[in-house]
Amino acid sequence: MLKDYALKILKKSLEYDVGFGDITTNSIIPEGVKAKGVIKAKEKCIVCGIDFIVAFFEEYGIKCKKLFNDGEEAYGNILEFEGDARTILMLERTALNLLMHLSGIATMTNRIVKKAKSVNKNVRVACTRKTLPLLSPLQKYAVYIGGGDTHRFRLDDCVLIKDNHIAIVGVKEAIRRAKENVSFTKKIEVEVSNLKELREALEERADIIMLDNFKPEEIEEALKIIDEFERKTNFKPIIEVSGGIKEDNILEYAKYNVDVISMGALTHSVKSVDMSLDIVRYQ
């Protein structure tokens, strides 16, 4: 299903890229020329999206041989292919753009997850919905391949009460309304921006509490309040921290006894992996 979705995205992207035709290739390369080539990772990476690219190439008659699977660390050749030279050159940039981007997300996620778990083996590193339009399912798949958590995919996955909901009805009323109107099968998460809102979320027994934009020292104070509430009531929610968290400061947050660290940077600030498509033989 995800492969089918990726193929639709790739074909639509190709349609835009080609326009009325690849005038460079068509003016230089004669019809009927066959070529063989490789896609090469020019830096170590976690491969992601290779099956999407194989499906894309094969849709246009290009035969492929995978050298690595999604989730594997790679360097050098990751895919071999052969077929019509004009077609290969037409597909090149569209294929590379997606493969480089998804592999970049998987690689960055993998690196950050390892850092976080070095100080807190139980913590989950999750992405957010700060994704590119139409690419969100693929970007979240890349986070998963890198060892991260996808968080909610869509608005119908769980209740997530954010600052603008709170601005209208307040923390307590928002949680009460969600419990009244949403199926018991859906967890209720609330984003809190200060200790007052935290206490209100605890009192209403939110399933998940997100400490949003809390500084490390504020997280420590919040956890004391949560622990005290647990001692009194035997209730403890899942604790998520989010806001301003990047690779260079992840350890400042992971050292605390939190369950989830969510990072928009996993999808909105990722560096693509350096890759190339090289023709190695033609006839």
From Swiss-Prot:
UniProt xrefs under CDD domains: QPRTase
Pfam family, any one: QRPTase_C
Catalyzed chemical reaction(s): nicotinate beta-D-ribonucleotide + CO2 + diphosphate = quinolinate + 5-phospho-alpha-D-ribose 1-diphosphate + 2 H(+)
Swiss-Prot/TrEMBL GO biological process terms: NAD biosynthetic process; quinolinate catabolic process
Key words, A-Z: Glycosyltransferase, Pyridine nucleotide biosynthesis, Transferase
Keyword Repressor annotated: no
GO MF term (any one): nicotinate-nucleotide diphosphorylase (carboxylating) activity
Family matches, as SUPFAM superfamilies: Nicotinate/Quinolinate PRTase C-terminal domain-like, Nicotinate/Quinolinate PRTase N-terminal domain-like
EC number: 2.4.2.19
First and last residue of the signal peptide: none
Pathway membership: Cofactor biosynthesis; NAD(+) biosynthesis; nicotinate D-ribonucleotide from quinolinate: step 1/1
Paired cysteines (S-S): none
Segments crossing the lipid bilayer: none
Cited NCBIfam families: nadC (TIGR00078)
Quaternary structure and interacting proteins, as annotated: Hexamer formed by 3 homodimers.
General function of this protein: Involved in the catabolism of quinolinic acid (QA).
The protein's name in its UniProt record: Probable nicotinate-nucleotide pyrophosphorylase [carboxylating]
Gene symbol of the encoding locus: nadC
